[in-house]
């Protein structure tokens, strides 16, 4: 299940819930970059 938060048509955060799968999925470099960028953006909005 994927939950996205959008403001003015721009996605500001996306959370993916994975129920039932026990296997840990390895993060690709693209996933790691997207995660870091998302964290950076959220920290900037909180300040």
Swiss-Prot record:
InterPro entries in the cross-refs: DUF7429
Pfam families: DUF7429
Domain of life according to the entry: Viruses
Protein name (Swiss-Prot/TrEMBL): Gene 60 protein
Protein's organism: Mycobacterium phage L5
Gene: 60
């Amino acid at each position: 299940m994927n939950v996205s938060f959008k403001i003015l048509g721009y996605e500001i955060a996306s959370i993916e819930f994975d129920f039932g799968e026990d296997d840990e999925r390895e993060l690709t470099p693209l996933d790691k970059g997207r995660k870091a960028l998302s964290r950076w953006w959220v920290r900037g909005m909180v300040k």
